[in-house]
Amino acid sequence: MSDMYCGIGKIPKGKERGTPEYCVQSNQVRYYGLKKIDRSLLETAKVKKTSLVKEQTKLNNLIEKGKQMLKEYNNLKLIINDEKSSKSAVNKARKRMEEIVLRKDRFVKDVKKQREIVNDLIEKEKEEEKAAKKAEKAEEKKKQSKNSTSKSGSKSSKSSSGSSKSSSKSSKSSKSSSGSSKSSSKSSKNSKKSSKKSNFRTQFGGKPTGQIW
C-alpha cells in the first residue's frame, strides 16, 4: 500500500497509481482531484473512523521490524560464537542481544494487538458489505412489489370496464325482449277481435245492419 502514488505527475519508478479509496483515506486527492470522486467516498473520509489501510500498513511495518530484529539477533549470535571475535565485540553483542530479547516480549504483544485490530476491521467491512447487499435486495423486492401491484390494479380496472359493458349489453337485450313481448301481446289481441267478428258473421249471415266491420 505504501507504494501507491496519488500525485498528478508521472508515477515514480517502483510505485503504482493509488486507488481512489487509498488516496481519500490518506488525504491525498491531488490526482483524483482532476476527476469526479464518488460522493460516498468523500462522506466516508469525513467520518472519523479507523482506516483498514492505515492499520494494515502499521501491521506490515511491525512485521518488517520483527524480521529485521530477528536478522540482527542471528548476526549477533554469529559474532558471539565466532572464535575470532574480540572480547569487547562479544560483550557488545551480548548486551545488544539482551536488549532485543527484552524488546521481543513487548513487540510480540504489539503485533498480536495490531493483528486483532486489522481482523476486526476486515470482519466489520464484510458485515457492512453484506448489509449493503441485503438492503439492495430489499429495495429491488420493494420495486418489484410496487410494479406488480400497479399491473394488478390496471387489470382489475379493465375487467371492471368489461363487466360494465357486458351489463349494458344485457340491459339492452332485456329491453328488446320486452318490446318483442308487447308486440306479441298486441298481435294476440287483434287475432281475438278478428275471430269474434268472423263468428258473428257466420252466426247471423253477413254484416249486421248499420254496422261496418
Swiss-Prot record:
Q: Which UniProt keywords apply?
A: Coiled coil
Record's compositionally biased regions (Basic and acidic residues): 122-142
Query: Where do the record's region annotations for Disordered lie?
Result: 122-213
Entry keyword annotation includes Membrane: no
Q: Where is the composition biased (Basic residues)?
A: 189-199
Coiled-coil intervals: 54-78, 108-151
Origin, by domain of life? Answer: Viruses
Decide whether keyword Coiled coil is in the record: yes
**Compositional bias per record (Low complexity), positions renumbered to this chain:** 146-188
Give the protein family.
Belongs to the mimivirus R546 family.
Protein's name in the database: Uncharacterized protein R546
